[in-house]
Regions:
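Active-site-facing substrate-recognition patch
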Residues: 1-65
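Gly/Ser/Thr-rich loops at beta-strand to alpha-helix junctions
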Residues: 75-81
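Active-site catalytic pocket residues across diverse enzymes, especially alpha/beta-hydrolases
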Residues: 63, 89, 93, 148
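A contiguous pocket-lining binding segment that forms or flanks enzyme active sites
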Residues: 114-158
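Short, glycine/charge-rich flexible loops or terminal/linker lids adjacent to PRPP-binding catalytic cores
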Residues: 83-124, 138, 203-206
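Structural detector of well-ordered beta-strand residues that form the stable sheet scaffold
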Residues: 71-72, 99, 152, 184
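PRPP-dependent phosphoribosyltransferase catalytic core
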Residues: 2-10, 14, 143, 147-219
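Short glycine-rich phosphate-binding loop at a beta-alpha junction
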Residues: 65-75
Length: 219
């Protein structure tokens, strides 16, 4: 793992954003997971700065190969992520535009459903916390298309590398195949397992590996 990924994991663990529990956490899918990541707890200036810095490093990581003009944050959770991350990118010497959508289309003033930079004719990367079913991302993809943007990638905080209820592939893999674009995450389940192997007890690692064996994507 790269230093920014290790820092991100440590901050998440230290602030109970990444949690582990022997009895597990019930997910929306109904599965009982030994870990839970709650990005909504990056809710202070310091923590949001650390989160956006991790996103920025992931964007600039050559291995992720992002090429874009505008960072798009889907309403509502993606809005602060887009704004904070372009600030972090600027601090690291890369100046990019940001944009986000309104849930309710404005019919006065400048009107429209987009706030921030125009998407027309520009390469766009979507930023979000996680991809569960992919529904919210698909809605964002349609907004970008209608606004004349060209979607080139998606970045999320965590890839659970977990099969959906409908298939043996993950939501991220499905989006990659469906949209034929670059989809990346700051960290993956594999990264979490490697991190816990060095920082937490053997029992936690065994629970994570058992969960991955049961629900993880193959290959």
């Amino acid at each position: 793992m790269r230093p920014y990924q290790l820092d991100f994991l440590q901050v998440s663990l230290d602030n109970d954003i990444l949690k582990f529990r022997n009895e597990g956490f019930v997910l929306k899918s109904g599965r009982l997971s030994p870990y839970f990541f709650n990005a909504g707890l990056f809710n202070t200036g310091r923590l949001l700065s650390q989160l956006s810095t991790a996103y920025a490093h992931a964007i600039l990581d050559p291995a992720n190969a992002f090429d874009f003009d505008v960072l798009f944050g889907p309403a509502y959770k993606g809005i602060p992520l887009a704004v904070a991350t372009v600030q972090a990118l600027a601090t690291l010497g890369t100046d990019k535009e940001y944009s986000f959508n309104r849930k309710e289309i404005k019919d006065h003033g400048e009107g429209g459903s987009i706030v921030g930079a125009s998407l027309k004719g520009k390469k766009v990367v979507i930023i979000d916390d996680v991809i569960t079913s992919g529904k919210a991302i698909r809605e964002a993809v349609e907004i970008i298309r209608l606004e004349g943007g060209v979607l080139t990638g998606i970045l999320v905080a965590v890839d659970r590398q977990e099969q959906t209820l409908e298939s043996t592939t993950s939501a991220i893999e499905s989006l990659k195949d469906e949209l034929n674009i670059n989809v990346q995450a700051i960290i993956t389940l594999q990264d979490i397992i490697e991190f816990t192997r060095k920082t937490l007890g053997k029992e936690t690692v065994q629970q994570l590996e058992a969960y991955r064996k049961q629900y993880g994507v193959k290959g």
